[in-house]
Regions:
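C-terminal SET catalytic tail plus cysteine-rich post-SET Zn-binding segment of SAM-dependent SET-domain
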Residues: 2-11, 114-167
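Catalytic cores of histone-lysine modification enzymes
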Residues: 8-11, 16, 23-118
C-alpha cells in the first residue's frame, strides 16, 4: 500500500498594506475576519449583522475605499445626502478620509449606536473594526460615529439607553 503524504501548501500571497488598499497578487484581498451579512436594520436603512459569535477585542474586518482629502470627503458627503441620503466616509486623519461609497465591504453598512459593540481603528491607513465586547450571532454590528458632517442636525435612532439624541 502506498504511503499517503499531504499535498504541499501553496505559498501565501503577499499583502501590500499601503494606504487603504489590500492587494494579493493584483487582486483585492478579503478584509473580513468574521462572517457578516447586510440586511434591513431597525436603526437605519441597511445594517451589518454577525453570522457567527465574535469574541471581545477581536478584529472583525476592514473597509476599503478611495483616499480623498477631508475637504473632498465633506463635499461628497453633502452631495450624497442631497441625492441618495447615504454617506460612506471615514476620516483617517485630520487631512485624509476614505470614501467607501463604491466598495463591496459589508462593514461600510455599520450603523451608529451611542452604545456600540465595535470600535473603529485606523492603523497605517487601514480602517479596521474591532469588537468592544462579545457579540452574539444575529446581533447588529454598530460603531459610535463620533463627530460627523451632520453637526448635531440628524436625529439618532439607535435606541440605546442614554442615547445622545443627535449625530
Amino acid at each position: 500500500m502506498p504511503t499517503l503524504r499531504p499535498l504541499p501548501q501553496a505559498p501565501q500571497p503577499a499583502i501590500d498594506s499601503t494606504a487603504a488598499t489590500l492587494r494579493a497578487k493584483g487582486q483585492a484581498a478579503d478584509p473580513q475576519k468574521f462572517a457578516v451579512e447586510v440586511r434591513p436594520s431597525t436603526i437605519d436603512g441597511q445594517g451589518v449583522f454577525a453570522l457567527e459569535a465574535i469574541a471581545a477585542r477581536r478584529k472583525i474586518g476592514e473597509i476599503r475605499g478611495e483616499a480623498v482629502s477631508t475637504a473632498e470627503a465633506f463635499k461628497r458627503a453633502r452631495a450624497a445626502e442631497k441625492s441618495t441620503g447615504r454617506v460612506f466616509m471615514v476620516a483617517v486623519s485630520h487631512a485624509r478620509s476614505v470614501d467607501a461609497t463604491h466598495t463591496t465591504d459589508p462593514l461600510r453598512f455599520a450603523n451608529h449606536s451611542c452604545a456600540p459593540n465595535m470600535v473603529l481603528k485606523v492603523q497605517q491607513g487601514r480602517v479596521a473594526f474591532h469588537a468592544l465586547r462579545d457579540i452574539a450571532v444575529g446581533e447588529e454590528l454598530t460603531v459610535a460615529y463620533g463627530p460627523t458632517h451632520h453637526a448635531g442636525r440628524l436625529a439618532c435612532r439607535c435606541g440605546a439607553p442614554g442615547c445622545m439624541g443627535t449625530l
